[in-house]
Amino acid sequence: MPYGLKRYQQAESLHFITFSCYHRLPYLSGPESKHVIETILERTRLRHEARVYAYVLMPEHVHLLINEPPNILLAQFLKSFKQTTSRKLKGSREQFWQDRYFDRNISGEEARSEVLQYIHRNPVKRGLVASPGQYEWSSYNHYATGVRGTVEIESEWTARHRRTHSSQ
């Protein structure tokens, strides 16, 4: 939960969330831990009817562009997600996640587009890959190809898929 920051909560409002591993240690460096994170993010998204617009799993932190779920506070959504992943991945570690997270309300298409680009370029900026499409642990390839990964991404591709399947 962010301390000392005002949060403007509104159903369906869009949030750019960043949270880190305990002491910013690279607990997410291996593919196994990233796969667990993606799987639990999708389960939590489904359970609370949240819409994920973008994400990236970095070695020591996570970025999400997500809406305020309709039936639960975003803080409760994140608590549920972090507790579940922590139980699954913690092992002998004292703590898996930092307690706090950063939350920035996003309004307008320009701000949304900037955050989307920032999230997808994060692995390139860090030198993990040469281009966003080479990084497996983000929503970039969904936007580039429309292929659904482990986490359902809210996009034009997804909306088109829903319309096609609901009319059948």
Language-model segment annotations:
Residues 1-168:
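Short catalytic/metal-binding and nucleic-acid-binding patches
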